[in-house]
């Protein structure tokens, strides 16, 4: 890992909580397969790039939760004159991203405790990552801390309503938690209002993918590393009878294009006062 000990790195390290280690391990395992099935992630990230303020030209940008580095490379192309940092909690993703380039440095780090100096960057870009953070106020406080005056936090995330079809179908089968939980959009509004950052954009929209069958959907979730990571999930394999019941329940949602999977995506662009 590059030595960034000069004015960039903060004096503290990163202390990942146990649940974060589980998330990191899951995404590390998915690194090799991620890009092949990341249609939603690419589309959402492109929309987030388009939401950046017109004429904005950061001298130093951070791709927070960089994953395979797809948007690190996009940011490097867009802001060629700036320095780029790619940050992720999953070492497997960082290894994959580092091999493909794009950023000047690749750093293991946690969005709730960024390994960056105060006032050290102009843009924090984070697409579909902070939904895995338990402490959203800490994420926003860290963004405010590390941004320079006039700097921007641009993020996309997921909120309640995501994978509702799958959640409702599992409810027909049993009482276990089978689908990742996400915070309500009202929480984003509340915490952004108290963050000390000025919201330029804060909205949500539904994006719907279609799959020929349930197996295709669950395969994609696993390939993305985004399968069920919640406490309360069932241990061990799911029996054939329950799977058949799940398939039957999900078929109620079938549309002409296939089985829908709805992602309720939050877009936020927040600026630090100059």
Swiss-Prot record:
Its EC number is 2.1.1.197. The keyword Methyltransferase applies. Gene3D superfamilies: Vaccinia Virus protein VP39. Pathway: Cofactor biosynthesis; biotin biosynthesis. Transmembrane segments: none annotated. GO terms for biological process: biotin biosynthetic process; methylation. Keywords: Biotin biosynthesis, Methyltransferase, S-adenosyl-L-methionine, Transferase. One of its GO terms (molecular function) is malonyl-CoA methyltransferase activity. It is an enzyme of class 2 (transferase). SUPFAM superfamilies: S-adenosyl-L-methionine-dependent methyltransferases (SSF53335). InterPro entries: BioC, Malonyl-ACP_OMT, Methyltransf_11, SAM-dependent_MTases_sf. It catalyses: malonyl-[ACP] + S-adenosyl-L-methionine = malonyl-[ACP] methyl ester + S-adenosyl-L-homocysteine. Converts the free carboxyl group of a malonyl-thioester to its methyl ester by transfer of a methyl group from S-adenosyl-L-methionine (SAM). It allows to synthesize pimeloyl-ACP via the fatty acid synthetic pathway. NCBIfam families: BioC. Belongs to the methyltransferase superfamily. This is Malonyl-[acyl-carrier protein] O-methyltransferase. It comes from Pseudomonas paraeruginosa (strain DSM 24068 / PA7) (Pseudomonas aeruginosa (strain PA7)).
């Amino acid at each position: 890992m590059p030595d960034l000990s000069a004015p960039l790195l903060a004096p503290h390290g990163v202390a990942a909580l146990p649940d974060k280690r589980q998330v990191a391990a899951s995404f590390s395992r998915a690194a090799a397969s991620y890009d092949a099935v990341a249609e939603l992630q690419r589309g959402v990230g492109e929309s987030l790039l388009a939401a950046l303020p017109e004429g904005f030209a950061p001298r130093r940008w951070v791709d927070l939760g960089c994953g395979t580095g797809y948007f690190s490379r996009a940011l490097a192309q867009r802001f060629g004159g700036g320095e780029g940092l790619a940050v992720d909690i999953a070492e497997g993703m960082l290894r994959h991203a580092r091999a493909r380039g794009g950023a000047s440095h690749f750093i293991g780090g946690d969005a709730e405790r960024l390994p960056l100096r105060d006032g050290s960057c102009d843009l924090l870009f984070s697409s579909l990552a902070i939904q895995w953070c338990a402490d959203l106020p800490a994420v926003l406080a860290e963004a405010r801390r590390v941004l320079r005056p006039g700097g921007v936090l641009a993020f996309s995330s997921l909120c309640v309503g995501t994978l509702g079809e799958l959640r409702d179908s599992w409810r027909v089968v049993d009482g276990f938690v089978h689908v990742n939980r996400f915070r309500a959009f009202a929480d984003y509004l509340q915490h952004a209002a108290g963050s000390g950052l000025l919201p330029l954009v804060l909205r949500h929209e539904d994006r719907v993918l279609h799959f020929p069958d349930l197996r295709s959907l669950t395969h994609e979730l696993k390939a993305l590393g985004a399968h069920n990571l919640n406490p309360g999930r069932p241990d061990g394999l799911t029996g054939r009878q329950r799977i058949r019941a799940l398939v039957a329940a999900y078929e109620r949602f079938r549309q002409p294009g296939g089985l829908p999977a709805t992602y309720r995506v939050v877009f936020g662009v927040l600026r630090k006062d100059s």
